Amino acid sequence: MSRLYAIILIALVFNVIMTIMPDMKVEAVSCEDCPEHCATKDQRAKCDNDRCVCEPK
């Protein structure tokens, strides 16, 4: 019975981690697509080392 609880706990922790992780990922958007990409988030586009960075307005 304790193995069942352990499996359920691991599944719940994994679910929480997978929910949080996409928010922390770095999006690989080229500088050409940066203005459109940041406009969808209502943020200002900035290109840094050939990488798109969205900053708050």
UniProtKB/Swiss-Prot annotation:
Residues 1-19 form the signal peptide. The keyword Secreted applies. It is found in: Secreted. It comes from the Eukaryota. InterPro entries: Scorpion_toxin-like_sf (IPR036574), Toxin_alpha-KTx_8/9 (IPR008911). Keywords: Disulfide bond, Ion channel impairing toxin, Neurotoxin, Potassium channel impairing toxin, Secreted, Signal, Toxin, Voltage-gated potassium channel impairing toxin. The keyword Signal applies. Residues 20-28 form a propeptide. Expressed by the venom gland. Disulfide bonds join 31-47, 34-52, 38-54. Pfam families: Toxin_6. GO terms for molecular function: ion channel inhibitor activity; potassium channel regulator activity; toxin activity. Belongs to the short scorpion toxin superfamily. Potassium channel inhibitor family. Alpha-KTx 08 subfamily. Inhibits Kv1.1/KCNA1, Kv1.3/KCNA3 and Shaker potassium channels. Has the structural arrangement of an alpha-helix connected to a beta-sheet by disulfide bonds (CSalpha/beta). This is Potassium channel toxin MeuTXKalpha2. It comes from Mesobuthus eupeus.
